[in-house]
């Protein structure tokens, strides 16, 4: 596996970065070759720029330096990774350092009115407003994320505040994700709080928001190619089962038109999975995305992550479906951010504890 991953004959690009990281992980985890792993992780770090990837590089460099007793350098690597506390690996590094939440993540940014923005009279912005009035949210998002490609921090805040003022979290997230590509973090827009968190008493509000954010980006109109519907992207067959369990009349139409109905059924299904896996958020999140059958297969291959002797971090890295692996990471990182934003206080970062149990 190492030979195939490391002899890629590439010098840059996304595939180069992925293969360098994989070569480093194999070297450290399976070959007991930390110095070799360090070289690959450094190559990966130099090849990437996004917050998620930079945090990933810092975390694994910290791990390999910790393994070779270079504790001072490991702390520096973890600290660099922890600068990206909105990310999965940034939170792993923060947890390793015993850090609490960065206050900027739950303090609302300086509220700048979009009405005073430099772009307010531009054709693209005016078109986005018309699309919003016509309830064409996907097209509205296209226009606003295009604008976000070139705006500075303050103008991005103003643009996201239009979406916030008009209760369009789907567009807020799109703007924030575009800003994050340039290293500009807008926490309120990146992790918008919605009243949907109160629609079910079966799950903590941060879990509902984290799942809905990943599933639909809080877009009630979302429909997947597989036929999953609405905020929680629940399949009609699953929704029918959950409606029967809750004593509700099943309505496919309401899955898209009634956000409370959608969230109640989606939350009931996720809660069923959490109970099935005896409180494991990690297994329940993976099953919500890939299905319980696949998760049970992975447990046979890689062990039970509820076992204290099994690393939940390594278990996540071994999820063979890239989509599910990424899904678990994105939902997990959102949990802590939503928890502190809802409560308005700094809390110790506890990502691995969240994955281990509910």
List each language-model region with its residue ranges.
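Catalytic glycan-binding domains that act on GlcNAc-containing polysaccharides
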Residues: 1-23, 32-36, 41, 50-56, ...
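TPR-adjacent "capping" and linker segments in tetratricopeptide-repeat scaffold/adaptor proteins
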Residues: 10-15, 109-122
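N-terminal pre-domains immediately preceding structured catalytic cores
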Residues: 46-48, 56, 131
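Long, contiguous interaction/recruitment modules in multidomain scaffold/adaptor proteins
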Residues: 86-90, 95-104
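Short coil/linker segments at helix-helix boundaries
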Residues: 103-115, 186-188
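Extracytoplasmic low-complexity/disordered linkers and repeat tracts associated with LysM-containing
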Residues: 113-116, 127, 349
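Alpha-helical segment of the N-proximal tetratricopeptide repeat
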Residues: 122-139, 143-146
């Amino acid at each position: 596996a190492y030979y195939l991953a490391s002899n890629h004959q590439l010098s840059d690009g996304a595939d180069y970065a992925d293969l360098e990281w994989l070569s480093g992980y194999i070297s450290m985890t399976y070959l007991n070759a930390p110095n070799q792993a360090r070289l690959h992780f450094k190559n990966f770090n130099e090849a990437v720029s996004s917050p998620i990837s930079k945090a990933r590089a810092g975390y694994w460099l910290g791990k390999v330096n910790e393994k070779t007793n270079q504790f001072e350098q490991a702390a520096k690597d973890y600290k660099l990774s922890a600068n990206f506390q909105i990310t999965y690996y940034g939170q792993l590094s923060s947890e390793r350092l015993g850090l609490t939440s960065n206050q900027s993540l739950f303090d609302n940014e300086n509220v700048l009115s979009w009405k005073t923005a430099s772009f307010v009279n531009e054709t693209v912005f005016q078109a986005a407003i018309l699309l919003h009035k016509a309830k064409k949210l996907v097209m509205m998002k296209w226009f606003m994320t295009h604008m976000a490609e070139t705006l500075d921090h303050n103008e991005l805040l103003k643009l996201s505040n239009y979406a916030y003022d008009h209760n369009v979290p789907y567009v807020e997230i799109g703007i924030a994700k575009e800003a994050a590509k340039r290293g500009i973090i807008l926490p309120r827009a990146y992790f918008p709080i919605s009243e949907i968190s109160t629609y079910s008493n079966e799950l903590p509000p941060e879990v509902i928001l984290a799942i809905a954010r990943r599933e639909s980006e809080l877009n009630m109109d979302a429909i997947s190619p597989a036929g999953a519907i609405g905020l929680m992207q629940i399949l009609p067959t699953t929704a029918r089962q959950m409606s029967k369990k809750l004593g509700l009349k099943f309505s496919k139409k309401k899955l898209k038109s009634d956000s409370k109905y959608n969230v109640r059924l989606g939350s009931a299904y996720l809660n069923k999975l959490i109970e099935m896996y005896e409180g494991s958020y990690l297994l329940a999140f993976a099953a919500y995305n890939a299905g319980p059958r696949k998760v049970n297969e992975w447990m046979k291959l890689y062990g039970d992550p509820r076992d204290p002797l099994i690393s939940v971090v390594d278990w996540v890295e071994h999820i063979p479906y890239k989509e599910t692996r990424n899904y678990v990471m994105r939902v997990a990182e959102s949990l802590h951010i939503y928890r502190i934003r809802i409560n308005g206080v700094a809390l110790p970062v506890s990502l691995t504890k969240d994955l281990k149990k509910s």
